[in-house]
Amino acid sequence: MVDCFDLLFPPTPGNAEIRVLTGAQAGRIVPVSFVLKTFKLSKENDFDTVGAPGLNGEPLRFMRGRARTLTMVLHFDGRATNTDVRQPMSEVTSLMNVDLDAHAPPVLSFEWTGFSLRCVLERAVVERFRSSFADGRPSRGQMRVAFRESKTLEELLVESRRE
């Protein structure tokens, strides 16, 4: 459903790059546009409760921190170049493919105006195609993505000693 506000004031796009850091495709750059208002960076911690009989509550015990998660809606528009948007969308989803040498998807870097996150692409869901060319090829589309921060054990140990 389209919000009337979005019709009057179209969402501001952000332009970013996804850089492949590891594997056979290291050095590859995938340019993307995203809906700025959907850019969300979150961090979570895990806590457990400690059973203490006779109390009106439960004491919490910190268990571990979780990696940061970056979510957003990517926007694809092929109207200016007469491009079927399924091609650039598949370039993004291909970043989830397992690298045969590493036996895992590649580590990436999401980069946008001074912000950089070393990550993996955890989830990519094609939400919709918004319009099409006369021959039926989709000309605009959106995809919801989630990146999970990727740090090595050594990086996490060094980081925990600094705090």
Predicted regions and their residues:
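Acidic, Ser/Thr- and Gly-enriched intrinsically disordered low-complexity segments
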Residues: 1-163
